[in-house]
């Protein structure tokens, strides 16, 4: 899958993975679902769900460390800045051959355009926050969020195209 294809999929994901409503109880249910999926996949994650700058769910699985919390913060900041997934932001920067600090003047100590943060979007209302994970390779973090969000909103298994590592464009 090349860069253009991945960007197109990221746009589709953000359009399709929208919720009807979201509250504190929803955050708890979603956070628990992420934890269970991580356990099934044998990966230790730090998990954070933030709405309007308030943390509604936070959990650090055994095997994570403070560094994972920092990655959560940095990825979440990208979603808040650009209103797109942290993975899609990284792809857009690659496409434009630039970086977060060069394009937006932000510190890379505070922002990371790597997979693992996804906007929480309410249908017909917009983005209210983000769901964020850290602990696996960043593409795996991103795909885990896609899988869980799709299942959480009741989309059929396999209806969301998971992303694969980038392949160069053929000449």
Swiss-Prot record:
Signal peptide: none annotated. Pfam families: HbpS-like (PF03928). Belongs to the UPF0303 family. This is UPF0303 protein YPK_1581. It comes from Yersinia pseudotuberculosis serotype O:3 (strain YPIII).
